[in-house]
C-alpha cells in the first residue's frame, strides 16, 4: 500500500483547473506535469489519457471524475485536481473545487467565456476558493491580438462580477497543446528553450507568486470530511479526504460524525498521503486514514472524522442564503415554506425542508434571504459552514450557516 515515506520539505499548496468543457483543462494539467518534470526529477509526468481515466469519458472527450496529479516548482509542492468541466458533473466540481487554495481558470481564446466559465467562477466563489489565476488557452488559433485583449477584458469583468479582483488577477496567454507536443518531442525542454513551454512556466510563476501559501488551520481541532471509503484486505477500512483543520497521527482517537443516529469513536491506525506513509497528516493534506474496528458499512461519504467533542451533528439551523437568478442557471420561479431541495455540505447532499421567516411569503430567484432548514439526516454542522442548495442535479443557491438551532 505505502511505498516510501512522504518527506515534507517545501510548502504544500492545493490547486486545480476549472472552466468550460473542451477549453483545455486536462491538456493543461498534463502540460504542467511535463514542464515541471523537465526541471525536477521528483515529478511524475501524466498524459491526457492518464488524467482522463474512466472509459466512458474518453469517448466523449469529457472529464468526469476528479483526477489528482502532483508537481513541484523550486518554491513549492502542488497537488492539482482536474475538475470536471461538463455541467452534468457539477456535483464533482463542488467537491473538487473545495480542495483548492487557488484555481487555474482555463478559457479558450477562440471561444471566450462560456456558460460553464461563469458557472465555475460562481462555484469557486460559493465553495470559498480564495484565488484565481487565468490561463487563456489556444491563443495559436486566434490571429488578431485585439481579439485576445477583448477576451481578457471579458474574463476580468466576469471575475469582478463574482467578487474576485478581476483587475489584479494574472492572465497568462498560451497553448497547452503546443507546449505538451513540444514536451512529447523533447521531454528535457527547459525554461527559455521554447516559447510555448515558457508560457507554462509563466503560469507556474504566477501560481507561485499570486496564490499565497495558505495559512493552515493546523492549530484547530482535527476535522476531515470523508470523500471515499475502501477496504484494504488484512488491514481494515480506510477513509480518504482532505484534512480541513488540525492534525492527525497514528494512535489518535477520532469520532465519526453525521448521517448516522449515533456518533462513534475509533482510533486511527495509519495515515497515508499519495500512497506513502506519513508521520502526521496536517490541515490541507489529502490523506487516507486507516480506522480501527470500523467496517466498510460504518463510515460513508458525507460524514466527518473529528477530534472527539469538537463538532456535533445537527438537523436544524438558520442560514443566510443567495438564490441564483434564472440567468445564472437558477430556478425560473420562486418557492415557499415547505420547499424541499438538497443541501450540499462538504461532500454530500442531504434533503431538507425550508421554513421562511414570518412576513416572507415567497423567495424569488436573485433574492438574498435568511431562513431555517430542517434536514432529514443529521450533519456535522457549525456556524460559518458554507453549502450549496441543489435540485435535480443543479445548483440553485448558496448559503452559510449563521446559527445552529438543534
Curated annotation (Swiss-Prot):
GTP binds at residues 19-26, 82-86, 137-140. It comes from Thermus aquaticus. One of its GO terms (cellular component) is cytosol. Residues 19-26 are annotated as: G1. It is an enzyme of class 3 (hydrolase). Residues 10-215 form the tr-type G domain. Residues 175-177 are annotated as: G5. PANTHER family: ELONGATION FACTOR TU, MITOCHONDRIAL, ELONGATION FACTOR TU-RELATED. Its EC number is 3.6.5.3. It catalyses: GTP + H2O = GDP + phosphate + H(+). It comes from the Bacteria. SUPFAM superfamilies: EF-Tu/eEF-1alpha/eIF2-gamma C-terminal domain, P-loop containing nucleoside triphosphate hydrolases, Translation proteins. Residues 61-65 are annotated as: G2. It is found in: Cytoplasm. GO terms for molecular function: GTP binding; GTPase activity; translation elongation factor activity. Coiled coil: none annotated. This is Elongation factor Tu. Belongs to the TRAFAC class translation factor GTPase superfamily. Classic translation factor GTPase family. EF-Tu/EF-1A subfamily. Keywords: Cytoplasm, Elongation factor, GTP-binding, Hydrolase, Magnesium, Metal-binding, Nucleotide-binding, Protein biosynthesis. Residues 82-85 are annotated as: G3. Mg(2+) binds at residue 26.
Amino acid at each position: 500500500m505505502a511505498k516510501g515515506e512522504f518527506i515534507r520539505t517545501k510548502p504544500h499548496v492545493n490547486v486545480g483547473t476549472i472552466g468550460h468543457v473542451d477549453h483545455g483543462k486536462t491538456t493543461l494539467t498534463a502540460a504542467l506535469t511535463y514542464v515541471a518534470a523537465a526541471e525536477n526529477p521528483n515529478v511524475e509526468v501524466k498524459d491526457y489519457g492518464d488524467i482522463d481515466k474512466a472509459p466512458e469519458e474518453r469517448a466523449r472527450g469529457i472529464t468526469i471524475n476528479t483526477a489528482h496529479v502532483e508537481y513541484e516548482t523550486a518554491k513549492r509542492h502542488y497537488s492539482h485536481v482536474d475538475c470536471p468541466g461538463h455541467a452534468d458533473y457539477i456535483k464533482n466540481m463542488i467537491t473538487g473545487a473545495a480542495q483548492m487554495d487557488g484555481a487555474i481558470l482555463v478559457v479558450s481564446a477562440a471561444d471566450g467565456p462560456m456558460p460553464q466559465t461563469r458557472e465555475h467562477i460562481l462555484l469557486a466563489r460559493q465553495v470559498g476558493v480564495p484565488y484565481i489565476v487565468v490561463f487563456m488557452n489556444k491563443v495559436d488559433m486566434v490571429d488578431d491580438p485585439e481579439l485576445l485583449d477583448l477576451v481578457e477584458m471579458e474574463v476580468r469583468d466576469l471575475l469582478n462580477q463574482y467578487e474576485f479582483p478581476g483587475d489584479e488577477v494574472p492572465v497568462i496567454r498560451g497553448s497547452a497543446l503546443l507546449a505538451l507536443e513540444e514536451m512529447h518531442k523533447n521531454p528535457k525542454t527547459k525554461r527559455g528553450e521554447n516559447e510555448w513551454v515558457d508560457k507554462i512556466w509563466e503560469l507556474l510563476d504566477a501560481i507561485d507568486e499570486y496564490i499565497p501559501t495558505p495559512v493552515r488551520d493546523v492549530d484547530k481541532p482535527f476535522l476531515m470530511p470523508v470523500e471515499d471509503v475502501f477496504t484494504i484486505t488484512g488491514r481494515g477500512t480506510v477513509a480518504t479526504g482532505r484534512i480541513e483543520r488540525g492534525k492527525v497521527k497514528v494512535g489518535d482517537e477520532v469520532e465519526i460524525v453525521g448521517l448516522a443516529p449515533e456518533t462513534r469513536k475509533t482510533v486511527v491506525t495509519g495515515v497515508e498521503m499519495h500512497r506513502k506513509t506519513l508521520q502526521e497528516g496536517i490541515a490541507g493534506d489529502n490523506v487516507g486514514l486507516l480506522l480501527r474496528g470500523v467496517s466498510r458499512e460504518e463510515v460513508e461519504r458525507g460524514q466527518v472524522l473529528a477530534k472527539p467533542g469538537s463538532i456535533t451533528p445537527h438537523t436544524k439551523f438558520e442560514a443566510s442564503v443567495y438564490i441564483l437568478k434564472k440567468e445564472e442557471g437558477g430556478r425560473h420561479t420562486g418557492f415557499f415554506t415547505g420547499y424541499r431541495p438538497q443541501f450540499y455540505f462538504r461532500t454530500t447532499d442531504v434533503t431538507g425542508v425550508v421554513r421562511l421567516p414570518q412576513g416572507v411569503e415567497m423567495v424569488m430567484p436573485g433574492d438574498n434571504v435568511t431562513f431555517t432548514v430542517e434536514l432529514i439526516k443529521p450533519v456535522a454542522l457549525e456556524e460559518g459552514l458554507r453549502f450549496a442548495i441543489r435540485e435535480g442535479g443543479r445548483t440553485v443557491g448558496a448559503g452559510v450557516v449563521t446559527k445552529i438551532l438543534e
